[in-house]
Curated annotation (Swiss-Prot):
Name of the top EC class for this enzyme: hydrolase
Signal peptide: 1-32
GO cellular component: extracellular region
Catalytic reaction equation(s): Endohydrolysis of (1->6)-alpha-D-glucosidic linkages in dextran
One matching Pfam family: Glyco_hydro_49
Domain of life: Bacteria
Record SUPFAM superfamilies: Dextranase, N-terminal domain, Pectin lyase-like
EC number: 3.2.1.11
GO molecular function, one term: dextranase activity
Protein name per the record: Dextranase
Family membership: Belongs to the glycosyl hydrolase 49 family.
Keywords, comma-separated and alphabetical: Glycosidase, Hydrolase, Secreted, Signal
Subcellular compartments: Secreted
Amino acid sequence: MPGTGLGRLAKHVTAAAAVFLISTGAVLPAQAETAPGSTPSAAPAASVEKHPITTANNGNLHTWWHDNGVFSPAAPTQSDEVRRSSLYDVRVAQANQPQKAYDAFTYMSIPRSGKGKIGYTEEDGAEFSSEAGLTMSWSSFEYAKDVWVEVSLRTGQTISSADQVQIRPSSYNFEKQLVDADTVRIKVPYSDAGYRFSVEFEPQLYTAYNDMSGDSGKLTTEAEGNRPIHTEPRNSMMVFAEPKLRGEQKERLVPTQESGSIHYPEPGEVRNLNSVSAEIIYFRPGTYSMGSDYHAVLPANVKWVYLAPGAYVKGAFRFLHDTQSQYKVTGYGVLSGEQYVYEADTNNSYNHLSGASNCHSSCVKMLQFASADAEQKLDLQGVTVAEPPYHSFVVYGNEQTFHMNVENYKQVGSWYWQTDGIELYQGSTMKNTFFNANDDVLKMYHSDVSIDNTVVWKNENGPVVQWGWTPRNIDNVNVTNTTVIHNRMYWKDVKYNTCIFNSSSHWEDMGSTTKADPNTTVKNMRFENTTVEGMTNCAIRVYALSDTENIHIKNFNIGSWNGLDWTSQVSHLKRYTNSAGEKVTIGNELPDGNGLAIENYSVGGQVIEKSGGNWSDYQLGRLGFDGENWDSWNAWKSAP
């Protein structure tokens, strides 16, 4: 829906990190077990470092550290602190010097940042993640040549083989070596695109189940009598290997004095950005805090916010004015919403959304822009957005004139509902990104949009790809190389806004079939090379609100269905009407090739073919498309 140090000893901080382990049965991946009725034990106390902390900053490798990092696995951090992972450590070495490894700070996000529900009691989407003790750790570095990345468990759990560690996307097929009982070494080749991947230790795996209660069921970690939904690490560990910027890219994405006047905030409390007179706000390495009752509403002169590697900014930015032709938000730093409550309402003193407000207009968004009738562009590059309290990115105004170039963007710790991915506006491109999201991830609402190389870790709410919610005119969309490494979409009833591909019914009344508009058209959308690792709930649900033509889904591979009944996993292709009863159309795929083309769609390695007898709702393909649309779709296996 619509500061860094070289050769310094880190603080000796002691804190226990809870690690919950369960047994899930022989049909699922091997997992560590806890004796029935026992309480999962906490990890060993984090204490003295194994070695002095050292970081790298040379032409081929750049890592960074926060001397104010603290182990706080269950409670909020102070304004001047950065939560350090109490579960993982990361070190990086150049491939030609594997024994000379440098530390890369490992961040950690916990549900609600440990705050609990402040000022509200209703559901916020973080219930299961909080109750199950989920966390998300991540570490970033810049590199220009091949590297070895060492990832160590701090939990006391051990492995005996590198094969007990899975890298996802699994297509990366990185070389792995066992260093010792808690450390694996991963060879990451250099790529101009970088890599964003999950490191998954077998003892950390758990399975989420649907308890089959009520209409939808609820997620639980209890196996007995329940249905498996997905297996994933309870404490995730993401590595973001980002390319060092050089030449024209560096000139475009890293500000200098030639770029304009620059304001350098001092680390610490930052609550005066509304009146900055410079054109550029440059956050150097360090920790910055806006507090829970402020976000930066920037003046018209500000065109660029830069977060340097090692900058950790607790806050959010609103570009209130629409006067700039070129905006930029760049840098490999972190922008964290951890201090805000869920749906922080600026009309309610930044407390949780009041009944008198509309969150769409008044709640804090991590990045918010206003667009004018004149052409505008945005470069969004490198930034890691952590723990959004609501939408992470919005643009309000003329959506046809705001064009975006998004590169190497990451989103982590999306525990709450409505923590969507990014909506790309007309003429925009996006590549080399990672999204942990708890709502629609890739929002395809506009024409002439191109997306490539996306890694998705999907939470419960919303689909992966969305182009519905209201009638639209969309033409020329290309989405390639999307990998869903995990998802917890679990509903046992048939929701309108879920699955991998989705065009939802109308947001005003999702049960209505009469809110379509035959005067609008969605056409020429191509989705190629979409891989879903592990189990998922459903493939495609299209509730067409517009005339629909030439939708091509090619090389769509699902690992397996979850443990729900086929009736919960069915795909739909439906045509809705307007209030006068006029039904939208879907192009004729057979024989005209102008409808919904599903080429090389497979489940568990078996290709689904319309002519092969494995496509229908109760069969492996789970395609329960309306009979009136028989000629509007085809599923087939193409020649190699």
